[in-house]
Structures are given as C-alpha cells and as structure tokens.
Amino acid sequence: MGAQKSIHAGRAKIDVNVDFTHKLCTSLMFPAFRDTSSPLSLVIGSLCIKHPNLFGGSEKLDVSWDKGLYDSNVLVAFRRPRPEWRPQQCFFIQHSLSPEIGVHGTPVDNFSRSGSGGVNLSKLALGLDLSEPASSKWSSTTSIKFEHVRPINDDGRAITRDLDGFPITCSGNTHDSMVVLKQESRFAKATDQGLSHFSMQIEQGIPVVSKWLIFNRFKFVASKGVRFGPAFLLASLTGGSIVGDMAPYQAFAIGGLGSVRGYGEGAVGSGRSCLVANTELALPLNKMTEGTIFLDCGTDLGSSRLVPGNPSMRQGKPGFGYGFGYGLRFKSPLGHLQVDYAINAFNQKTLYFGVTNLASST
C-alpha cells in the first residue's frame, strides 16, 4: 500500500515516496481517540520527498507530510555535507497538530482506553541538530530549537483552559514559547547471545525572554536482552523527571503501548516523574510464528500532584498500574503481524492488533 518514484531534475534525482500503510498499521494498535466506528478512521497518509543534491554540493533536502483525520505533521530538513570527523548538521522546521490524550484524555472502560479531553496541541519548531561522529558503540546528538505551542479545541479555536476550567499553558496565555537545548547520548551493543541498549536525554529550557519556559527535563531508557536457547528475554526500564516551569501537557504520560499495556494512553497516570518497567519473553513456535508473554508496570512516583492543575487526580487515574498477557508474532514476505492480549489491574481485557513492514510497490 505504498508507492515510490524517482524523478530526474537535471543531474539530481528526487525520490518521492507515498505510504498509506506505516501509520495505518500503527494506528490499528490503538483504540480510537474519539467516537469513531472503525480504526480505519485513524489512517494517516505519508508523503516524503527527498532531494540528494539540492545546490550541486551534495546538500540534502527532505520534506515529509503525514496527514490524518485528527492530526498532521510537516517536517522540512536540510543537511549540508561535512567531513566525517566533524558533527553533522541538520537544520529543520516542523509543524504538527495532534490530540493531547496522555494528560488531558479521559480514561474509560476500567482505564483500558482514553477518550478525547477536548485539547489539541499545535506545535511549531525550528532549530539545528548536531550529530557527533559515532565512537565505538556510543553516539550523541545535540540540538537547539525554538518551540511555540498553542492549545486548541476540537473546533480549531485557541483555548487557555481545559474542560474543568484549569489552565493548559504555563504562561496562562493562548500559547507557550521556549528555547530548548537538548543533549542525547546512546549506547548500543548486540551479539548472538543478546543485546544491550541505553539512552539518556537531557533538555534545558533557556531563559531568552522572561515569559518563556525555564525547565530541566531528563529521560533514560535501559534495555537488556538475553538469549536462552531458542527463547529470548527482553527487559527494559524507562524513567524521567522534570523540574522548573511546566505546562500540564509536558507531564510524563504512563499507560498504553510502549508503556503499560492493558491501559489507555496515559490512563495509569501523568506526573513530573515516572518509572516504567517492561519484560517480555519470546518463544519460537515455528519458522513463521513466535509466541510471547509479557509483564508491564508503571508509576508516577507520587508526582501527579506536582503537575499544574493535577489533571491525573481529577480524572481518577490510579498513579500505579500493571498489565500482563500474551501475544503472537507472524512473519511473512508481505509484512509482520502482531497480536497482543493484555489484562490490566482492573481485570479489563484489551486486544491489540498491528501490521508492520509491509512491502511497497514501485
């Protein structure tokens, strides 16, 4: 369900890629944000245009556009060639619009799904990424960006308060602005016996203007995989915290795929801090099929009361939750099919379905 075309413009070749499957398959794994009768309402079409030699000096221009029924994302990135021993530069400008579900969404069906809270975020960002040359198994990226965040309701009108009358922005105005300096370091190692992965992100809000947000936020992800004969055990720990100025939408949202399965997005809680642990054991059933059992748990470490307006408490989120279950992974030349069956702490059952890596036609 994709198409790719190369167009020759002078000496340059422009690659155009249209994809209706990647986002679609991701969205099928999530319950609908709003009252929709089919997960197909979350289909997102992707258009990507790449120019590998914009000014004749190997400058690269990438333009991507993702558009769905409720959200959209436009990204323009420009890269200049530099010696391999110097940091690689990428100038970017990005605009996105999406429902804010993790913090302002309302949990339903024993916290297994999250409905719309009537808050959407329109974000405009522009900045510079500097990727350091990889050293051994370590790599790092430094970026600085200006970000403008404007909350809007489902009708597209700017808002300053949520449905309960509490402020959405940190400034109290219809928007928040900030300059953010970000440093990310990554370690990755893979062998026949297993894998190790660690990443650390640190973000610092810079006080360029007095009303702009000043904060420090960090997040880490540590994963370890070990092979026991045909079985493979993967465990990961994710955590983070934020201090300083903060808008509610900046809180860590706990719950959902990639967090605690069996819960809706952010249905476990949302706080200034978080800690999430995931464990999954995979066993091959045959050449094409793999079975898994998993256990997820997460907590806001009692920090939800420190989020302005305490949206987690107002929505009755527990602040701690766990989910367990089993799943199947099917591999084929056309793509990978994933099915997960999860049960949360309230004995509510949720079925996740997804397809990835579909073959594209040219």
From Swiss-Prot:
Cellular location(s): Plastid, Chloroplast outer membrane
GO cellular component: chloroplast; chloroplast outer membrane
UniProt note: phenotype after gene disruption: Stunted growth, pale-green leaves, altered plastid structures in leaves, altered photosynthesis activity, and reduced accumulation of starch in leaf chloroplasts.
Plastid listed as a keyword: yes
One Pfam family it belongs to: Omp85
Tissue: Expressed in germinating seeds. Expressed in the vasculature of roots, cotyledons and leaves.
Source superkingdom: Eukaryota
Gene3D superfamilies (UniProt xref): membrane protein fhac: a member of the omp85/tpsb transporter family
Keyword Repressor tagged: no
MF terms in GO: channel activity
Main location: plastid
PANTHER family: OUTER ENVELOPE PROTEIN 36, CHLOROPLASTIC-RELATED, SORTING AND ASSEMBLY MACHINERY SAMM50 PROTEIN FAMILY MEMBER
General function of this protein: Beta-barrel pore-forming protein which possesses voltage-dependent channel activity. Required for proper plastid development. Involved in the maintenance of metabolic homeostasis of full-grown plants.
Membership in a protein family: Belongs to the OEP80 (TC 1.B.33.2) family.
Name of the protein in question: Outer envelope protein 39, chloroplastic
Phylogenetic lineage: Eukaryota, Viridiplantae, Streptophyta, Embryophyta, Tracheophyta
